[in-house]
A protein has these predicted regions:
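Solvent-exposed interaction surfaces and binding hotspots enriched for charged
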Residues: 2-253
Length: 253
C-alpha cells in the first residue's frame, strides 16, 4: 500500500538525542525527576517542556506507526501536521478556560449546510502561521535549515481550505505524486489526539505551548527524515494537514 519508508534506519530514528526525559543509559527518568528537571530548565528556557514533549511525540509515533517495513514517512508528517493544526485550536480553548471565558470566544464560527461546524479567526491564524513562534514559522525554519530552497504557498492552502468548507474535498491534501500519506489528516487526528494529549499536557503544561510541542515534533522528524524525504515536501505534507485540521470540530470527525 505504501511506497516510501524509513526502512532500515527506523531504529536509529526512534532514538532521539539525549534530553532530560531520556538520561544516559537509555532508561526513562522517573516521572517526578523528569518534571523536576523540566521545572528547573524552564528558568533558562521557557520552551523546554514543549521541546521535550516534541521529542516524546515523535518517539511515540515512530513506535506506533512502525511495521515490518519501517515507518511510512509521508504518513508521519501528515499525522504531525494534523496534530499541530488542531493543537492551535485546542490551545486557544485551553487559554480561554484558564481565563474563565467561553472556549468558543476566540473563534469566528462557521456552520455549513451539511451540518458541520468550523472555526476561524485571527488568534487561530496567528498560532498556526502568523506569529513568530507559529507552527508555520518553526516548521518552515527547519525546512530551510535542512536545505529547502522553496516553500509551499501557505496562502494558497488557506484559500483552498476555506473554499472547500462543506464539501467532500475539505481536508483532502493536494496530491504530491509519489508522496501520498496512508490516510487522511482527519483519521490521524481522530485516533492520535486523545492518545497524545495527556503527555503533551504533562510535559508542555501551559496550553500556549501545545502547538509548539507539535511544531518541535515536526522539526525533530524533519531532521531524522531529511535524507529520505525532501524537507520542502515534508513541510508541504505537514501544512496541507495542519491548516484544515485547525478548523474542525474534533467530536464530529
Amino acid at each position: 500500500m505504501f511506497t516510501k519508508w524509513f526502512g532500515k534506519s527506523t531504529k536509529e530514528l526512534a532514538r532521539p538525542e539525549r534530553t532530560p526525559s531520556r538520561p544516559a543509559g537509555g532508561t526513562a527518568w522517573p516521572e517526578d525527576a523528569l518534571m523536576a528537571a523540566i521545572a528547573k530548565q524552564k528558568q533558562v528556557d521557557p520552551l523546554v517542556g514543549a521541546k521535550i514533549g516534541g521529542k516524546e511525540v515523535v518517539g511515540r509515533l515512530l513506535s506506533a506507526m512502525k511495521d515490518d517495513k519501517g515507518v511510512h514517512v509521508e504518513s508521519l508528517f501528515c499525522a504531525l501536521g494534523a496534530l499541530a493544526g488542531y493543537a492551535c485550536q485546542a490551545s486557544l480553548r485551553g487559554q480561554a478556560i484558564v481565563r474563565g471565558v467561553d472556549p468558543n470566544a476566540p473563534f469566528n464560527i462557521v456552520n455549513t449546510a451539511d451540518g458541520k461546524t468550523y472555526f476561524f479567526g485571527d488568534p487561530l491564524n496567528g498560532a498556526l502561521a502568523e506569529e513568530g513562534l507559529s507552527v508555520w514559522a518553526l516548521a518552515a525554519g527547519a525546512a530551510r535549515h535542512h536545505g529547502a530552497t522553496s516553500l509551499p504557498d501557505i496562502n494558497e492552502i488557506f484559500q483552498r481550505t476555506a473554499s472547500a468548507l462543506g464539501t467532500e474535498q475539505f481536508g483532502v491534501p493536494r496530491a504530491i505524486p509519489g508522496h501520498a500519506a496512508g490516510a487522511l489528516p482527519a483519521a490521524y487526528l481522530r485516533s492520535l489526539w486523545p492518545a497524545l494529549l495527556p503527555i503533551v499536557k504533562k510535559l508542555a503544561g501551559d496550553p500556549v505551548l501545545w502547538p509548539l510541542t507539535y511544531a518541535f515534533a515536526i522539526q525533530e522528524a524533519m531532521a531524522m527524515a531529511k535524507d529520505t524525504l525532501a524537507p520542502h515536501i515534508a513541510l508541504t505534507i505537514a501544512m496541507e494537514a495542519a491548516i484544515p485540521m485547525s478548523k474542525v470540530e474534533l467530536s464530529t470527525l
